[in-house]
Curated annotation (Swiss-Prot):
<dbReference type="GO" id="GO:0008237">
    <property type="term" value="F:metallopeptidase activity"/>
</dbReference>
<dbReference type="InterPro" id="IPR051463">
    <property type="entry name" value="Peptidase_U62_metallo"/>
</dbReference>
<dbReference type="InterPro" id="IPR045569">
    <property type="entry name" value="Metalloprtase-TldD/E_C"/>
</dbReference>
<dbReference type="Pfam" id="PF01523">
    <property type="entry name" value="PmbA_TldD_1st"/>
</dbReference>
<comment type="function">
    <text>Probable metalloprotease.</text>
</comment>
<dbReference type="GO" id="GO:0006508">
    <property type="term" value="P:proteolysis"/>
</dbReference>
<dbReference type="InterPro" id="IPR045570">
    <property type="entry name" value="Metalloprtase-TldD/E_cen_dom"/>
</dbReference>
<keyword id="KW-0482">Metalloprotease</keyword>
<protein>
    <recommendedName>
        <fullName>Metalloprotease slr1322</fullName>
        <ecNumber>3.4.-.-</ecNumber>
    </recommendedName>
</protein>
<dbReference type="Pfam" id="PF19289">
    <property type="entry name" value="PmbA_TldD_3rd"/>
</dbReference>
<dbReference type="GO" id="GO:0005829">
    <property type="term" value="C:cytosol"/>
</dbReference>
<dbReference type="InterPro" id="IPR035068">
    <property type="entry name" value="TldD/PmbA_N"/>
</dbReference>
<keyword id="KW-0378">Hydrolase</keyword>
<dbReference type="InterPro" id="IPR002510">
    <property type="entry name" value="Metalloprtase-TldD/E_N"/>
</dbReference>
<dbReference type="InterPro" id="IPR036059">
    <property type="entry name" value="TldD/PmbA_sf"/>
</dbReference>
<dbReference type="Pfam" id="PF19290">
    <property type="entry name" value="PmbA_TldD_2nd"/>
</dbReference>
<comment type="similarity">
    <text>Belongs to the peptidase U62 family.</text>
</comment>
Length: 489
């Protein structure tokens, strides 16, 4: 029987990395028995996703720490398939009896029952444990992260730097979180895999005001494999960049609404491709028939100069994973090549229901969610143009340096605020602009991305969908969109 987790009241010092608490090969016998019970009951497929989390967030507002929040959780999600139907049950009781009860509930939802108590049920054979955590010595990561006092000191020092560089600052916020997650996946196809993930993010948010003039600028970065990440954060440079952007936007003119060619900066500019197109290439959308690309595989859906990828392999990128939450090794997935749709993003359920092959993209926020097809590191590939080539091609347009929030409809209609923009005239930046909103549809914008530079950049992001919020990377080089509706004044 697997070990029982005992929670300490001393949250700051608690960790799950002592040998007796790990999710590892010692769970094989219990999970093999449970999987055998599920198959004997008539299920076509059964999966257990076990998880332990040690999370902490820290917020500094101006010159005080206003929030320091540790959170611990553990639990398991049980998924049962019968034909193309499935159900999902989660529990925070990870004892053998707790997992058996969750399995029994899942089976009953599909009209199945566990074998009688005296029945002989053979254990299901699991593969040798694929231990991504052990292979990369991830078991030591949590011990090496910044303790809470160090988090607080670094963020307060960062806010002082921001105060030094910013003018007319009304609110300075520095925020950090560390999310340590251990997962173990066992399934009736023999899958038996373990991993530890360490996700960290830190950044600034600055609000400035001078009379009637207002502006808000934020900047975050993230990492997935460096326990020393917070210690090595370049708060000085980040503070300078945020303060400089805020200073330019504070007195910027409002943009005039109209249709313009736009140049989008690299890195976080890729959020529009992620939101307006990437989600439409997830098999979840195919299942619900809410994507305009439903039957377009092999057809042209974008400008011939556009190639795009989704992958989980780039070192330290925010969406990088060694395996997905269904135990499948990650990989590179070519989405679009020279404008032609090549592949969709698929999890197990999406593959069963749509026929598209799995891509190592089954992801979830936690054990409370069933995995679904989700993006990882998604970006437009570098092109053959220089940044100067792109700017020189624009007689009058808008340069979108930083993107803000936005919304996307089920079939790809979007609007996104631009938090830092500039007027482009004859290939040159002439003045800062504020109040710009980009409005369009996925099918429209994809065919108007006519130029891509060679300076691919990636940025950390957070993506919400049916399986909760997951960590992702968005990215692109500088790109030109030949024309798009820009809302303004």
């Amino acid at each position: 029987m697997p070990p029982t987790l005992l929670l300490s009241q001393d949250l700051p010092s608690l960790n799950y990395t002592t040998p007796g608490d790990r999710l590892d090969g010692r769970w094989r016998e219990s999970l093999s028995t449970l999987l055998g019970l599920g198959r004997a009951a008539g299920a076509d497929f059964v999966e257990f996703f076990l998880e332990k989390v040690n999370y902490v967030s820290c917020l500094a507002e101006d010159d005080a720490i206003t929030s320091l929040t540790p959170r611990l959780s553990s639990g398991c999600g049980v998924r049962v398939y019968k034909g193309k139907g499935d159900c999902y049950v989660s529990t925070n009781d990870i004892s053998f009896n707790g997992l058996r009860t969750a399995l029994e509930k899942g089976l009953s939802i599909l009209g199945l029952t566990l074998p009688a108590g005296q029945s002989f049920v053979p254990e299901l054979n699991l593969e040798m444990l694929r231990d991504y955590a052990g292979a990369k010595e991830k078991d030591q990561w949590l011990h090496r992260c910044s303790p809470m006092q160090e988090m607080s000191d670094i963020l307060l020092g960062a806010n002082q730097k921001l105060d030094h560089y910013a003018s007319h600052a009304q609110s300075r916020r520095a925020a950090y979180f560390r999310d340590w997650q251990e997962v173990l996946v066992a399934a009736s196809d023999g899958t038996f895999a373990r991993d530890i993930r360490l996700t960290q993010s830190v950044g600034f948010s600055l609000f400035c005001a001078d009379g009637e003039h207002r502006t808000s600028i934020g900047k975050r970065s993230g990492d997935t494999s460096n326990p020393d990440y917070l210690r090595t954060w370049d708060a000085e440079t980040s503070a300078q960049e945020v303060a400089e952007s805020a200073g330019k936007m504070l007195y910027a003119d409002y943009v005039e609404s109209g249709n313009y060619p736009i140049i989008m900066a690299n890195q976080f500019g890729g959020v529009i491709f992620h939101e307006a197109c990437g989600h439409l290439l997830e098999t979840t959308q195919i299942e619900h028939k809410t994507t305009p690309f439903l039957d377009k595989k092999g057809e042209k859906i974008a400008h011939e100069n556009l190639t795009a990828w989704d992958e989980g392999l780039t070192d330290n990128a925010f969406g990088t994973i060694d395996m997905d939450d269904e135990g499948m090794p990650t990989q590179r997935t070519l989405l679009i090549e020279n404008g032609i749709l090549k592949n969709f993003i698929a999890d197990r359920t999406g593959s069963i229901r749509t026929g598209h092959p799995r891509t190592g993209s089954g992801r979830r926020q936690s054990y409370a969610y069933a995995a679904a097809s989700r993006m990882r590191n998604t970006y437009i590939a570098p092109g053959n143009y220089s940044v100067d080539d792109i700017f020189n091609s624009v007689e009058k347009g808008i340069y979108c340096k930083q993107m803000g929030g936005g919304s996307v409809g089920a079939t790809g209609e979007f609007n996104f605020a631009v938090s830092e923009a500039y007027l482009v005239e004859n290939g040159k930046l002439t003045k800062p602009l504020k109040g710009a909103t980009l409005i369009g549809t996925a099918t429209e914008i994809m065919n108007k991305i006519s130029m891509s530079s060679q300076d691919l950049g990636l940025a950390a992001g957070f993506c919400g969908s049916v399986s909760g919020s997951v960590y992702v990377t968005v990215g692109q080089p500088h790109i030109k969109v030949d024309g798009i509706t820009v809302g303004g004044r």
